[in-house]
Amino acid sequence: MAVPQNRVTRSRRNMRRSHDALVAANPAECPNCGELKRPHHVCGACGHYDSREVVAVTAETDLDEDAA
């Protein structure tokens, strides 16, 4: 089993962890429908990318209403 040869100081430990921080999402507004979407990705609400429809979006069905 691996055992540390020398103690890792607080400074060296923290410098190693300096790149581990999470980066917040940077959503952009879809120019077609106005929903928030990830930059350089197809809009999940309307299926448009770069002012063109690339994915045909079907109407969502509510499963709770069908069961009742």
UniProtKB/Swiss-Prot annotation:
Name the keywords, alphabetized.
Ribonucleoprotein, Ribosomal protein
Tell me which SUPFAM superfamilies the record gives.
Zn-binding ribosomal proteins (SSF57829)
Which Gene Ontology cellular component terms are annotated? large ribosomal subunit
| InterPro entries, per database record | Ribosomal_bL32, Ribosomal_bL32_bact, Ribosomal_zn-bd
Q: Residues of the signal sequence?
A: none
Q: Which GO terms describe its biological process?
A: translation
Q: TM spans, by residue? A: none
Domain of life here?
Bacteria
Pfam families, per database record: Ribosomal_L32p
Any one GO MF term held by the record is: structural constituent of ribosome
Protein family per UniProt: Belongs to the bacterial ribosomal protein bL32 family.
Which PANTHER family does the annotation name? 50S RIBOSOMAL PROTEIN L32, LARGE RIBOSOMAL SUBUNIT PROTEIN BL32
The name of this protein is Large ribosomal subunit protein bL32
